[in-house]
Amino acid sequence: MLDFNLAEILFENRPNKYWKMLRQIGVKNAVGVLPRSFSDWRKHDEETPWNYLSLVKYKNMINDSGFILDAIEDNPPMERVQFNLEGKEEDIENIAKMIENFGKLGIKTWCYNWMAGIGWFRSFTHLNTEFGKVSGFNINDIKNAENYHIKTDRKSLWENLKYFLDNIIPVAEKNNVNLAMHPDDPPIDNFTGIPRIMNSIESYDKLLALNTSPYNGITLCQGNFTLMTENLPDVIKHFNKRIFFVHFRDVIGNKNNFMETLLGHGKTDMHKCMEAYNDINFKGIMRVDHVPTLASDDAYVPGYSYLDRLYSIGYINGLRDSVNS
């Protein structure tokens, strides 16, 4: 029987009406971000969101709003580690401190990524007659983009990732915190002159082989993984217990040219995916991810509209009930 934690990401630094709506429809679990905003007029906390005092206030705010904080999905500064720059030891120290504080606070999962330079990217957000306001990517839109100001190569990125894992996995093991690597988004080979290395099924096999700890795992973002494979349910079964966190979303197109869609309107058989999660007895965290913006929605973050996220939560619950029946 499927018994995962259906969570929702809370971007806001204060409770708002959407948080109330989530509780009204039965969502109890939350995914948070690092608390980068000031907590009060003294402006103490912004530069150190990985510190215990910043995190405990943030967790208490989420708990007081009726949610359980299951995961943090956010990278602290780690560019010096990714590019092997002077000062990388300080970044490692801060990340280790963050993981220790997650353990103290009962935050069981950290979703991070290895997108060196620029993180996830969309090249358009526009109105679409079928889905409303949609976001997507076309590789032709970036062909004249300036290269990132730091240079590296694929081999170095893998070596730097191994250094990171060798230093952080022991801290995660000691503090019972799962590390869940998010794929490159989009999963193309190169972005602004920087190679992407977490962009295929084979790259995830290599990630898990770099450090075989059971705490070294995956954020299976379906919108990215479905651009890497024609059989996402088989990939779910392949990675099995190393999947700690799922982003349940879909797209149409391919990795070089895609658009994000309503659930049920994309390229993936979502019911078969849910059956695959049942087959592996998935007990982790699942959340809605990038969605279109429907008419009259006042959400301000492209891909994270309120109305379609509520629709998607209902869709996931319906699929889960169908599989469980």
Model-inferred region functions:
Residues 33-162, 166, 173-174, 224:
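Structural motif corresponding to the early beta-alpha repeats
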Residues 30, 182, 221:
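Active-site glycine-centered loops adjacent to acidic/histidine catalytic or metal-binding residues
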Residues 141-157, 183-193, 296-299:
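Active-site-proximal beta-alpha loop/turn segments in soluble metabolic enzymes
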Residues 21-39:
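Basic, amphipathic N-terminal segments that precede the first structured/catalytic domain
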Residues 11-14, 35-39, 74, 115, ...:
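An acidic- and aromatic-residue-enriched active-site/binding cleft used to recognize and process polar
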Residues 1-5, 12-14, 19-21, 26, ...:
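Histidine-acidic metal/acid-base catalytic patches
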